[in-house]
Amino acid sequence: PSGMLHGNGKCIIGPGVVKEKKVLCPTSSGDHFLNLALEGATDITCFDINRLSKYYQELKITLIKRLDYSDFENILFSNDVYTCLITYFSNNDVQFKKYLKESVYEFWSNVVKQYEINSIMSHDVQVDAYWNNKYLLNEKNYYQLKNRLKTVKLRYLDCDIKNLNKITPEKYDYIFTSNIF
């Protein structure tokens, strides 16, 4: 489609391409959703066979809604992203219980209780991937996304791409099938 550039394995959505559009994308780390919301998509369905992706995306969305840019940046750009997330979650447990969906809160609460960093994730979890996301390039984009998250419609489908047509009859303006953004 016009307005989309491809190169070096990245997909960059040009201004206005997905504005007020219905979009389907992989849940993955949540960055597809966040970048599409920043670009103005208003109805986004995320799919992933890995249900853990949904929990991670929901945590990121909640952090963006609750934190200012520098605090969010300090967590995601730290040398040990996972430890920072766990620490922040455990220090702000009451707030998270209030803002996260119950199943998401229970998931992260259990992760904190059973926390053993080396057995769950490596210390450099996707740190380099964050530099490629438009919503993190500057404060203006971050706060614009934060504002758009108030109105974007989000749904999840727990399925593989091969089963999408069996799971949903929905039609979309744009469909992204890769988690490389």
Label the model's feature ranges.
Residues 49-150:
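Class I S-adenosyl-L-methionine-dependent methyltransferase module
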